[in-house]
Structure formats: structure tokens, C-alpha cells
């Protein structure tokens, strides 16, 4: 029960700080003009909350391992490349390369989103609830999916498309949670998978 309370409270506070840009607001003079800088700072500041929670749950030298960050970077990268290569080839064949996409937008939507979303939603929320709070896979994965889907409601331009974005990303969240668990909680697998799945969505139209 203690683990669940700490994890859920920390995540609720993180989500509020991140969603309302409270982390990036004090630094807006430094991040103005760069979406990537704003997103990075907002994630880092908001991320101090789950980081503090992890210090309550684990010894400092065990935190990276509890998140799945202490090993498997190379195997995660290989998995991500092989899993998304057909997607990249498919988009290249049927899509049009967007020559106007900026490096700042690419960094924001591919690298920062892919890394931090998996760090928080998979490594912290799902991983900590499933592995250490002893939640079952489905309860932990579904709660994470609802939160993850809600994060992407903005992608819809009306109610129907917003619900569609929610459904697709929530289902994707369950899939990422399953991959994370099946790969022995190697977070790099889902970080690379998420990042490289975002890439063709951004660079091809």
C-alpha cells in the first residue's frame, strides 16, 4: 500500500506540473524560441517529483536498475531498429518527406518525447506499480494507458478524433508495457521503439 500511495501521488503531482507547464514557466526567458528547450526543462523540473519518490522507495544505487536503465542499451537499440525498420520503409514508400520539419521539432517530438514519456509512464508508473507495488499486469498497464492516452487528447481537432487519438495511444501504451515486461524490464527497448516509431510520423506526411 505504501508503494502505491507514493507512486500514484508522485505521478499525479508530476502530471499536474508537466501538463500546465509549471516546470518550464520559471525558465521561459531562457527557453523562448525553442520548443525542445521548453519541453526538456519542463520534463526535468516535473521529473524531480517522481525522482524524489524513487528515493523513498529504493536505495540510490538501485534506482537505475529499478527503472530498467542500468543495462541493455545496445540490445534495446538493436530491437528498436529492427522492429521499426519496416515502418520506416513503408512510410518512405507511400509518404512524402517533409523538407520543412525543423531540427527543433524533430528533437522535441522524437527524442525528448520518446525518452521522457517512456521514463515516466513505463519506467516509473507501470514499472514501479507492477514490480514493486505488486499490482497485476492489467491494472498497472491499464492505469498507465489511461494516463498516457489522456496526454495525447490534444492531437484530435474534435471530439471524435480526440477519442481516436486516446484509443490508439492507450492501446500503444499497453503494448509498450508488455514489451517492457517481456524484455525483462529493459527500459531501453521501449525508449528506442517509441523514439524510432515517432521518427517516420514526423518526417513523412
Q: Residue ranges of each PLM-predicted region?
A:
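N-terminal, membrane-interfacial amphipathic/helix-forming hydrophobic leader that caps
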Residues: 1-62, 199-205
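Alpha-helical transmembrane spans of integral membrane proteins, capturing the lipid-embedded, hydrophobic core
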Residues: 7-15, 43-51, 77-85, 141, ...
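Juxtamembrane helix-loop-helix connectors linking adjacent transmembrane helices
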Residues: 26-43, 54-119, 126, 131
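Transmembrane helix-loop-helix hairpins at the membrane interface
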Residues: 87, 91, 99-205
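N-terminal membrane topogenic signal
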Residues: 1-10, 73-78, 135-136, 186
Amino acid at each position: 500500500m505504501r508503494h502505491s500511495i507514493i507512486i500514484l501521488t508522485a505521478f499525479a503531482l508530476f502530471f499536474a506540473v508537466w501538463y500546465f507547464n509549471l516546470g518550464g514557466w520559471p525558465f521561459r526567458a531562457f527557453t523562448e524560441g525553442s520548443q525542445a528547450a521548453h519541453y526538456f526543462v519542463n520534463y526535468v523540473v516535473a521529473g524531480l517529483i517522481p525522482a524524489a519518490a524513487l528515493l523513498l522507495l529504493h536505495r540510490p544505487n538501485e534506482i537505475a536498475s529499478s527503472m530498467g536503465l542500468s543495462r541493455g542499451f545496445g540490445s534495446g537499440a538493436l530491437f528498436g531498429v529492427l522492429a521499426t525498420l519496416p515502418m520506416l520503409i513503408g512510410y518512405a514508400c507511400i509518404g512524402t518527406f517533409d523538407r520543412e520539419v525543423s531540427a527543433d521539432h524533430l528533437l522535441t517530438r522524437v527524442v525528448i518525447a520518446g525518452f521522457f514519456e517512456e521514463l515516466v509512464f513505463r519506467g516509473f508508473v507501470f514499472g514501479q506499480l507492477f514490480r514493486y507495488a505488486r499490482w497485476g499486469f492489467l491494472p498497472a498497464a491499464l492505469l498507465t494507458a489511461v494516463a498516457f492516452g489522456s496526454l495525447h487528447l490534444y492531437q484530435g481537432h474534435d471530439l471524435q478524433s480526440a477519442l481516436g487519438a486516446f484509443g490508439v495511444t492507450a492501446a500503444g501504451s499497453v503494448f509498450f508495457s508488455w514489451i517492457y515486461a517481456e524484455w525483462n524490464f529493459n527500459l531501453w527497448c521501449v525508449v528506442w521503439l517509441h523514439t524510432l516509431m515517432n521518427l517516420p510520423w514526423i518526417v513523412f506526411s
